């Protein structure tokens, strides 16, 4: 929903892929997934469908965790509506610096908005809880290392380390950036092994 220049799911997010369904049908899909043994209800980039999702979820609780899988650019007001409905938050923290946020996502306020959103997510869930190797509640912050943007990655790592204590949240440092058709400048190449290793060393 940010239309990032490096979006890995452009067909879905920007080309109208999908079909309309009602909140009633969405609830039926949730129920079918649970009956089939799904470990969670994973809602991917659901923010612009918040009203429909909340209607479909009802008052709950569901027998499996409800997962809010998002890009991090969320409003605190919307997140507050999800309290006690969502057990697991999977936000991206794409940027901690304004310059790449503006250049690649047209959202200079992304760092401020995403940090506030993640703090609200953590307020709701508290420290993460694992059960039989599965995340049952909590916040898992993801960060995709971008080519030539190691300083941004370091700033993300710094904020997470300074904001949370060990055991509060999970953090995933991702390396799978793939240049999209028409990518230019820094985004025209993959992340090098040296860049990713440097990010790992900094995180350690």
Residue ranges and their predicted role:
Residues 1-20:
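Canonical Radical SAM [4Fe-4S] cluster-binding loop centered on the CxxxCxxC motif
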Residues 17-29:
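Short cysteine/histidine-rich metal-coordination sites, predominantly Zn2+-binding motifs
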Residues 30-185:
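Conserved AdoMet/S-adenosylmethionine-binding subsite of the radical SAM
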Residues 186-191:
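Acceptor-substrate binding/catalytic loop of class I
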Residues 194-204:
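A cross-taxonomic marker for long C-terminal extensions/tails that follow the last structured domain
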Residues 20-23, 150, 154, 193:
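Electropositive phosphate-/nucleotide-binding environments in soluble metabolic enzymes
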